[in-house]
């Protein structure tokens, strides 16, 4: 699993039938800043994920990849490799609060 920030959406009018009705979002993975371990920073990479929790633009989310992405009831029969499974409220690392959704 990893943390990511929702950066956008993907619309595909031509796709396999099993993906019809599923929201696709772009996300940028986050990591602890190696120069300032009190904050999260983007990695510069982009992933497309199926959203199973109703996430929105700018939210910090929890992502699973690979076979784990197909273990939710919503995705078990989908050809996906990355799934949003949670919207993050807080992140604490080494006793420090790195993220709090209430203060963003």
Regions found by a protein language model. Name each.
Residues 9, 30, 66-67:
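Short, surface-exposed secondary-structure boundary micro-motifs
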């Amino acid at each position: 699993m990893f943390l990511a920030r929702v950066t956008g959406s993907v619309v595909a009018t031509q796709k396999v039938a099993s993906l019809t009705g599923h929201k696709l979002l772009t996300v940028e993975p986050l990591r602890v800043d190696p120069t300032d371990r009190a904050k999260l920073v983007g990695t510069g990479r982009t992933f497309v994920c199926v959203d199973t929790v109703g996430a929105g633009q700018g939210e910090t989310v929890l992502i699973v990849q690979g076979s784990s992405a197909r273990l939710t009831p919503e995705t078990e029969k989908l050809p996906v490799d990355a799934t949003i499974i949670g919207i993050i409220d807080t992140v604490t690392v080494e006793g420090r609060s790195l993220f709090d959704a209430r203060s963003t």
